[in-house]
Amino acid sequence: PLNIGGIQGVCIFTGLPVPEIAKGAFGLERHEQEGLFELSRLCIRPDTQQTEYNITSWFVARCIKRLRRETKVRAIISYADSDYHNGTIYRACNFRYCGLSDRKKDFYFADGTKHSRGSIKGEEGEWRDRTQKHRYVMVFDKSLDLLWSDKSSVLSSD
């Protein structure tokens, strides 16, 4: 955590949530995914962002440096929700932009709740488009072959 007179921000790295991400990004099988991380949560207090110039990129860079010091990091993947932003902070931290995630749909029951898992046969509801995410990757292991193409030139600013 970022602690300047109290916690100002948090950056959380997790293992990849599903093995298919590493398969799509690097062609890696389930048993080859050690050292791959997702920057899954990043939060900085808004008042801190307004008073401290470049605090978010500074903080993310320090967190990545610490993670690499404490464990083997081959690559970090992160996503920016296209409904809210396009990932300016990741570009500022030298992540490579790799386009949008695949289009997907989720099933919503008639009462408006989202279906999580299992069969929906015979259920009333509708399929809704899921928001696509901007994909960002930072590769440290030069032996990894990034299969997602670099799309930096096609991304407009926030």
Language-model-detected regions and their locations in the chain:
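Acyl-donor binding region in acyl/amide transferases
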Residues: 14-128, 135-138
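Short, cationic low-complexity segments
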Residues: 148-158
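C-terminal accessory regions of radical SAM enzymes
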Residues: 135-148
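Conserved beta-hairpin
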Residues: 1-18
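Amide-forming acyltransferase catalytic core, primarily the GNAT-like/NAT-type
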Residues: 1-5, 130-133, 139
